[in-house]
């Protein structure tokens, strides 16, 4: 128990150090927040010879990086890496012993345990798929209540992927029967708890209360929806992830197919709703636009 307490404290300290780096990046970039994800995939060539989204240079984590020992170590691509003093240790929770594929590839441990709230910076600055109605915090000044907007969290090793954690907002604020997980699950290695850091710089641990949060019941990579009605953990994350974006329907976002995102160099590269995907706004009651 004493060892778990010590590793839990170390994890919270990692979160605080990463938030210092996060704020330093914003200071150097006119108050902009770093992107939660971008695509970096050398095996795929975009038009004009680009092998990655230009926004990868401004992303917390680039590419479909599982964090489990890919052939290339993507950690140093992170735009936060130099702001941590190139300290690799702060990206890894000492309680994260679940190395999965890394062990098969000869790695002693996964190099990244944390993922970033997709709404804190977005995928290259944009909402992911059907999330157009939800606010993306692109500037530090966008956070009206920074102490209650999480930025980083421990992510389950079976679902850690492209750098971000997407809280599914279906059911917010008052229809808990629609709560669900899809692809992304939080970690629970801190005695069924998870570390979070927030936009004001503080870090805290959340103790999970529901079995669906602790035990993954579907292959995350299959992107299946797991309905988890009345799950208080989902309610807790939704309350701290984002809020509706007023006037989102009037912002003229082109709803492009995800797979065509590389065909045109938009100001921000990113994901839009795929054909046939159920939009998030149809899953929730009409929200109030509170901060």
Task: Label the predicted regions.
Residues 1-5:
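C-terminal juxtamembrane segment of a hydrophobic transmembrane alpha-helix
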Residues 7, 11-291:
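Short, well-structured segments within or immediately adjacent to enzyme catalytic domains
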